[in-house]
Amino acid sequence: MELDNVKMAHNVYQTCVEEGVRRAVIFSSNHAADYYENLIWSDRMEFVTPDMLPLSDNYYGWAKSTYELLGFAFATGGVNDGKALEVVQLRIGGPRETDLANANPDDLNRVHRSLGAYLSVRDQLQFVVKSVETDDIADENGVPFQVFYGVSANDHNFWSIANARRVIGYDPQDNSQVKFANELAAILQSAKSSQYGD
């Protein structure tokens, strides 16, 4: 199935070039580099940045990283006689309002992940619009290609959004720790009670 999805991504890029589309904005996934989360949760790494080698330990993430790398080949123009396609890859975090409601107080790493991955609706809209409308997305080598993490301005972030702020002016307005303060307090109280008793 994932091989079919990679072929589909190729067809999307190729069709964009053939039809004269200037830019493809692709919803990738944080799973394109999800292997690094193992290092984060074992305290061997603090942040994942979009410029790190995309490493995944599963087929889904592998397919997403393959879309991204294929997009880079199209952005260079190397696969279409010099016809470059601008490509933005959006590694979306957790665009759900329910993750904390389902959190297990005995798994605080999962709670941390839910808080760090959160992407509010209004931040997602801004993120996508700016990815489409920003005039110049060229990287430091002049290639019109970017990978951005899509998360809100969360205190618990473990994916860097610095390049999205710099390149497209992404300015997220929401913070999961503030938005879900009541839910977080209840989870932490439950975890404390479970660990130390009432």
Where are these regions (language model features)?
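Alpha-helical substrate-binding/gating segment
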Residues: V79, G94-L108, Y118-P144, A153
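Conserved C-terminal active-site "lid" loop/helix of NAD(P)H-dependent oxidoreductases
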Residues: P105, P144-D171, I187-Y196
